[in-house]
């Protein structure tokens, strides 16, 4: 019985440590015009994911779990249309500003 109590305490301790630590790398998976995540084949840092992340308004991204992950990508910029609307400086699309 004592082993079960000790095991339970260890499980609770480790779960609390994980929740206290929080997210080390806040970010998100960006989505394209169809709502799908961008697929990538070269895991880790690569030019394709950096380019995708720049389209979404952040400067750094990499391939994680075969999808592009953009660090510090906010929820409002996850979809490509919202990212363009929030970061585009094209005066033809927005003649009076945003």
Curated annotation (Swiss-Prot):
Matching Gene3D superfamilies: Knottin, scorpion toxin-like
Record site feature (Important for blocking potassium channels, in non-edited version), residues: 48, 51
Disulfide-linked positions: 40-63, 49-68, 53-70
Key words, A-Z: Amidation, Disulfide bond, G-protein coupled receptor impairing toxin, Ion channel impairing toxin, Neurotoxin, Potassium channel impairing toxin, Secreted, Signal, Toxin, Voltage-gated potassium channel impairing toxin, Voltage-gated sodium channel impairing toxin
GO cellular component, one term: extracellular region
Signal peptide residues on this chain, from the entry's feature table: 1-22
Tissue expression from the record: Expressed by the venom gland.
Family: Belongs to the long (3 C-C) scorpion toxin superfamily.
Assembly, per entry: Monomer (edited version) and heterodimer (non-edited version) of this alpha chain and a beta chain (AC Q95P90).
Name under which the protein is recorded: Lipolysis-activating peptide 1-alpha chain
């Amino acid at each position: 019985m004592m082993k079960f109590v000790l095991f339970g305490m260890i499980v609770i301790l480790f779960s609390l440590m994980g929740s206290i630590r929080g997210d080390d790398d806040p970010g998100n998976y960006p989505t394209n015009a169809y709502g799908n995540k961008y697929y990538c084949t070269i895991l880790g840092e690569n030019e394709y994911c950096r380019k995708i992340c720049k389209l979404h308004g952040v400067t750094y991204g990499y391939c994680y779990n075969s999808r592009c992950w953009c660090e510090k990508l906010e929820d409002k910029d996850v979809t490509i249309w919202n990212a363009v609307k929030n970061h585009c400086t094209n005066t033809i699309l927005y003649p009076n500003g945003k």
